């Protein structure tokens, strides 16, 4: 039974990564980072909440690489920071969103939504805007400003948007896959 569950979790993780690839490719013509970012965050949250922490972390690490390969993401040197921001989102959704506050799971998921979104924003803002760009990258001022803008408030907005959609989808998905009743 343990082996079957492991295979199922790996398969679901692969499906979520494939979904991420398809969605990023499909959204590329829109050239709208708010839509793409929100959907990526949604997939990250769904992966951790339906498949577990290891699945969520796997998708979190693969996501920025896929984005860069599609030409969506910024510089290769920023991928570790982006993966760290994704990991913060995933870890907090896992540890907060899977808890019950009183009898209500929705309270924990609401707490996860806001806490994880802010944590991802903070990791990206500090890591990229305050450390990577001024200390390591030596970018021209105009390029530094564009990248700094990408990794500030828009990241909070996309994490909150993806989290809000996930908040409503998770109970239905878990019920559909047999992971949660009602």
Each language-model region and where it sits:
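Loop-helix junctions at membrane interfaces
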Residues: 1-182
């Amino acid at each position: 039974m343990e082996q079957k569950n492991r295979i199922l979790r790996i398969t679901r993780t692969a499906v979520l990564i494939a979904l991420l690839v398809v969605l990023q490719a499909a959204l590329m013509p829109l050239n709208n980072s708010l839509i793409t970012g929100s959907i990526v965050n949604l997939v990250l949250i769904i992966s951790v909440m339906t498949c577990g922490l290891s699945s969520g972390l796997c998708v979190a690490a693969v996501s920025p690489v896929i984005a860069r390969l599609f030409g969506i993401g910024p510089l290769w040197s920023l991928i570790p920071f982006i993966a760290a921001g994704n990991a913060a989102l995933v870890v907090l959704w896992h540890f907060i969103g899977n808890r019950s506050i009183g009898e209500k799971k929705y309270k924990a998921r609401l707490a996860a939504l806001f806490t994880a979104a802010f944590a991802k924003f903070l990791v990206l803002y500090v890591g990229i805007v305050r450390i990577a760009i001024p200390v390591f990258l030596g970018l021209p001022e105009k390029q530094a400003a564009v990248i700094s803008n990408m990794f500030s408030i828009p990241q909070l907005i996309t994490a909150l948007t993806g989290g809000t959609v996930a908040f409503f989808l998770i109970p239905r998905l878990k019920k559909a896959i047999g992971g949660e009743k009602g």
